[in-house]
């Protein structure tokens, strides 16, 4: 109650211009976050499902209790080519929707076969001075105490935008076991 009274007294002391500027900034922040939420929800609802094979997981991240560092096998090919950042990786999907590396491209309009997709990747700096490539998310957060379920994760399930200006954008849905079933 006391803080509410102080808050109202501070608002009364503010000029109308200051109040407008603060309100406009708050509105811009809310619009920014709202736009990003809508964009990510669109990727999840309209994106095409792809499974990316995971490289062996760093066990230290499991010991922290609530997240797992993800490294996708497809990124091994990008490392080998010393690729630029924020470009596209062409992958071919097998019958189980598992992605296999084909090539790299700078062109979002490149002609693709029916079973191929573009995945947007980015080059990130490591905390230890190195670099790594990411596709979608590079970590998976889960409820504390449930780490044992995710030790057997073999694939990351992602949704990928296949057309428009966001082509190749990926959102992580969850992790799958060796049978390609989503771990819940």
PLM-predicted stretches and their roles:
Residues 19-36:
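Hydrophobic membrane-insertion alpha-helices, especially the h-region
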Residues 51-53, 92, 159:
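Generic structural detector for well-ordered beta-strands
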Residues 1-13:
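Short, Lys/Arg-enriched N-terminal segments with co-localized hydrophobic residues
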């Amino acid at each position: 109650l006391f803080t509410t009274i102080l808050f109202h007294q501070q608002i009364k002391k503010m000029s109308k211009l200051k109040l407008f500027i603060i309100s406009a900034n708050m509105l811009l922040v809310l619009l920014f976050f709202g736009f990003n939420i809508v964009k990510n929800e669109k990727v999840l609802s309209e994106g095409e499902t792809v499974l990316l094979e995971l490289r062996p997981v760093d066990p230290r991240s499991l010991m922290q209790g609530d997240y797992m560092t993800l490294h996708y096998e497809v990124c091994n090919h990008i490392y080998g080519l010393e690729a630029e950042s924020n470009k596209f990786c062409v992958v071919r999907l097998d019958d189980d929707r598992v992605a296999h590396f084909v090539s790299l491209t700078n062109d979002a309009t490149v002609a693709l076969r029916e079973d191929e997709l573009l995945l947007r990747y980015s080059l990130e700096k490591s905390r230890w001075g190195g670099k790594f490539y990411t596709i979608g998310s590079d970590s998976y957060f889960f409820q504390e105490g449930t780490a044992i379920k995710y030790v057997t994760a073999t694939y990351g399930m992602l949704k990928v935008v296949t057309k428009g200006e966001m082509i190749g954008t990926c959102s992580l849905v969850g992790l799958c076991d060796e049978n390609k079933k989503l771990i819940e």
